[in-house]
Structure formats: C-alpha cells, structure tokens
C-alpha cells in the first residue's frame, strides 16, 4: 500500500525565508530519519509563512499507513510552532 499525502502548513512566527528553510530542513530530516518516509517541500517555497509538504510512505496495510501518517502529524504539531491548515491524502 502506497500512501501519498500533502500537508499545508502555516508558520506564523517565521520572519524570513532563511528562518523558514532552517525550520523545515530540521523538521524534514527528523521525519525522514524517524519514520522512513520520503518528504519534500513541494510548494510555497517563497512564502515566509506557508509551506506545502508532500509525503510518500509504503506499508503492507492501509491501517498501518494511516497510523504512521497520524504519528507524523502528531510529531509535527508537538515539536514545531506550525499549524496544519489542510491535509490531502491518496492511496495509490
């Protein structure tokens, strides 16, 4: 089972693109290491307070994939000052 999902994030406290890039770089590296998923910033690279992250993960079962997505969401919300505005998910 392949799960593709996108998160639209609001970063209300970033003051520059450099600061945003540093926050996202740290976040993405930790997520990749911890959850073994592929993730990139796929949109809004030039917007200081917004970002869209695209994830792909593979699991044998749909329930496991959804559970891992929820763990990633929880990790982001607990460890970073961001707001998840939108979630789009699709099973491939």
Enumerate the language-model features and the residues they cover.
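Absolute protein N-terminus
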Residues: 1-2, 92
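Beta-strand elements of well-folded, non-transmembrane domains
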Residues: 9-13, 59
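C-terminal structural segments of small proteins and small subunits
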Residues: 57-92
């Amino acid at each position: 089972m392949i799960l593709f999902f996108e998160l639209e994030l609001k970063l209300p406290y970033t003051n520059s693109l450099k600061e945003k890039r540093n926050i996202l770089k740290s976040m993405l590296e930790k997520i990749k290491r911890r959850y073994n998923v592929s993730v990139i910033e796929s949109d809004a690279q030039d917007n200081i307070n917004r970002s869209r992250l695209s994830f792909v993960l593979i699991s044998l079962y749909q329930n496991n994939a959804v559970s891992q997505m929820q763990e990633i969401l929880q990790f982001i919300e607990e460890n970073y000052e961001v707001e998840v505005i939108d979630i789009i998910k699709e099973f491939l």
